[in-house]
Amino acid sequence: MATDVRYDAERVGEWGTPVAVAGGSYTVESFTLPDGAKLHLRVWRAANPAAPTLALLHGLGAHSGWFNDMANSLNAAGLHVYVPDHRGFGRSDGERGHTRDWRSYPADVSALLDEIGRREANSKLFALGHSMGGIFVTYAAAEDAKRVTPRLAGIIAMNPWIKNVTNLSLGNTFSVLFGGMRGSSRQVIYPYDVNTMTKNPEAQRMLEADTYWGKTQSASFLYQVGLRMRGQVMARAKEVHAPALVVQGEGDVVVSQPATKQYFETLGSADRTFKTYPGYSHDCEFETDRSALDQDIAAWIHAHSA
């Protein structure tokens, strides 16, 4: 949609105001994981109980508040939309940007998908992952392919974090390698830059004031997720059987666009689609006119729900 979202200093970390469609609802919930940790969860429900359902997984340092406007748009297009904050991010439980075991994230996503599947038993379930979330949905789909009855009707990888364009400094790289292998919780400043994330000045203002934005991650997190988990994503991509839509912004200077195309070509999905968007930055949820992307995502989901 073409958006007129503006920075609102009173709504920290919120890009857009969540709204419920006619006959639907918007709620903020807390989802309890098997180990007792609670995930902050935003839920947009469509008027039709059998509408397709989308689980939207954010990227590194982000949180669900960045996707309010996009979720509003997808909900208005006839989808139920669930957007969690990952463990250790945003308003969810967990040490900030820290883990000693990358496997906690696939486990969390699996538990969440199980819960959504129980709630939306008459709905087709899809998962969209932005950046780091693209890794998470790939693992989820690879695991799902081994099930007798898969949960996912399809996945969408949006500017997936397959390979960086800008890397950590040499000193921080050594810190991640040696500290990460020891499970160090020492925080490492990741090379975030609002100017590379988005060209939207209103979104840049929101980001610069966002106290929920995780601008640092621990050496252990970057080792476990950024190196170990991400290092296996191509192998997991080969195991994906579900239909897949891969989207890449042509203005993205955060992740490697050739690596995204290689990821697409590696996917084991027989039904796969690759789409690019001229001028779209890495954090395309902040585009001033995101209508082409939102329409394509909704149309693809509806087509695969028939």
Please name every model-derived segment.
Residues 1-33, 37-46:
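An N-terminal hydrophobic leader/cap segment in hydrolases
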Residues 51-59:
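Short beta-strand element of the alpha/beta-hydrolase
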Residues 61-64, 90-124:
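Catalytic nucleophile-loop/oxyanion-hole region of alpha/beta-hydrolase
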Residues 71-95:
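Conserved alpha/beta-hydrolase
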Residues 131-218:
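Alpha/beta-hydrolase-fold enzymes
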Residues 240, 246-248, 252:
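Short beta-strand/loop motif that positions the catalytic acidic residue
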Residues 242, 256-265:
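Short alpha-helix in the alpha/beta-hydrolase fold that links the catalytic acid
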Residues 273-306:
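Catalytic active-site module of serine/aspartate enzymes centered on a nucleophile-bearing elbow/loop
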